[in-house]
């Protein structure tokens, strides 16, 4: 299924206006994006009567990069989440368009409330706090947190990190950050996952907490695997969901839910999973 991509800088001015109206100026580290005023102001009906912010497009808010869930490769946005949402777009008879925006604006529900996108797929964990502002699809991914540290650090748990008085880093606005705080840490926060990894590589922190698939993807890179290692997997019982505007369009919600459910039943989900993670569901760790 084809898709198009709206980079952050292309529509930065419009995003700043929306952010100002919503009081979101302090939300995140990167520039946010939005549809043009004419697109955001009115919805258009797609197959089955779905109301979409842009004619012929299922517009997805995400935060790049978050490999292997969503990242740019050869000028295109690809990834596990992209393939999942493509299934829903196909059901609606449209193509997917991707908008790169700060994760804090996504998880607050403000991006969809402002008409920036129809759905959000950004490796986003379903939480009760987020449910207050976002409607979620059925779960599409079982998530686990992980700790990445310099080789020889000698830690295998958050307890070890605390006992050794090591500096912990986490990505801002994430459940990894929340989990660390619940365990008594005050982590150094980084705006996105690449900055978090750079913080570890540059010695700003000694250990970082991040979703396991992201850590495993980093470790495929020789420059990371040479000096750093996965020291712990933390079973936090998290599940990702596709986010929708509160009081979501029932046609869009049904398309997303049906796409996920049917893909799991007919083997498509497993094919996508193996494509991006190299293992079948339940084998990742």
Can you say where each PLM-predicted feature lies in the sequence?
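Bacterial lipoprotein signal-peptidase II cleavage site
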Residues: 24-41
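Extracytoplasmic small-molecule ligand-binding "clamshell" domains
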Residues: 40, 45-122
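Acidic, polar ligand-binding/catalytic clefts
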Residues: 97-160
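Sec-dependent bacterial lipoprotein signal peptides
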Residues: 1-25
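Short loop->beta-strand "edge-of-pocket" segments that line small-molecule binding or catalytic clefts
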Residues: 59-62, 158-173
């Amino acid at each position: 299924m084809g898709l198009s991509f709206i980079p952050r800088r292309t529509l930065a001015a419009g995003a700043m206006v929306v952010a100002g109206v919503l009081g979101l100026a302090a939300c995140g580290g990167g520039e946010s994006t939005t549809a043009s005023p004419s697109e955001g102001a009115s919805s258009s009906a797609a197959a089955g009567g779905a109301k979409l912010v842009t004619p012929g497009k299922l517009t997805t808010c995400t935060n790049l990069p978050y490999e292997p869930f969503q990242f740019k490769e050869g000028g295109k946005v690809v990834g596990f989440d992209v393939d999942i949402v493509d299934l829903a777009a196909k059901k609606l008879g449209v193509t997917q368009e991707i908008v790169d925006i700060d994760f804090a604006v996504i998880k607050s529900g403000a991006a969809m409330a402002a008409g920036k996108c129809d759905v959000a797929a950004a490796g986003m964990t379903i939480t009760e706090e987020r449910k207050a502002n976002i409607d979620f699809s059925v779960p599409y991914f079982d998530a686990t947190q992980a700790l990445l540290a310099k080789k020889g650090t000698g830690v295998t748990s958050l307890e070890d990190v605390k006992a050794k008085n090591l500096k912990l880093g986490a990505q801002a606005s994430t459940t990894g950050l929340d989990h660390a705080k619940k365990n008594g840490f005050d982590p150094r926060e980084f705006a996105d996952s690449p900055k978090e990894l750079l913080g570890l590589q540059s010695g700003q922190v000694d250990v970082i907490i991040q979703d396991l698939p992201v850590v495993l993807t980093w470790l495929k890179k020789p420059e990371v695997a040479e000096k750093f290692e996965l020291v712990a997997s933390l079973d936090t019982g998290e599940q990702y969901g596709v986010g929708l505007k509160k009081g979501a369009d029932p046609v869009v919600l049904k398309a997303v839910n049906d796409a996920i459910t049917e893909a799991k039943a007919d083997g498509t989900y497993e094919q996508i999973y193996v494509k991006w993670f190299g293992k079948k569901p339940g084998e990742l760790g």
